[in-house]
């Protein structure tokens, strides 16, 4: 009986010693425990978290294609979906882009990839913002109802990226 108690105490001590501190990240260590620098941004994405908020008053879908072109569908200041196109480049972990009218994205983003298989996610951070995008299929209704950016009134055309 005494040996059993000692054995249980040793096991508990070993388990306690193996634990890492939380560091305020919901059960994990730092950001590198969840995100990796290795991955591919190619795919269809929906913005699911913006600056730590999951309750978004706007919608953003982003399609990054293998040929370094992108399609951005957004409704930010109206209920209209607006469609933008352009090209993007990935230099290490820096993602930047240029709209088809020649205007650059508002900023470049550091990109990281989720380490978990499902749901597949990417994290885009800039000096002022952090967005988490989750892999999805862009709904046909969004694509079909989107207004091309060139015909949108200027008050509704503030670009998300």
Task: Go through each PLM region and give its residues.
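Lipid interaction determinants
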Residues: 21-84, 94-161
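Positively charged n-region of N-terminal signal peptides that target proteins for export
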Residues: 1-5
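C-terminal motif of bacterial Sec signal peptides marking the signal peptidase cleavage site
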Residues: 15-18
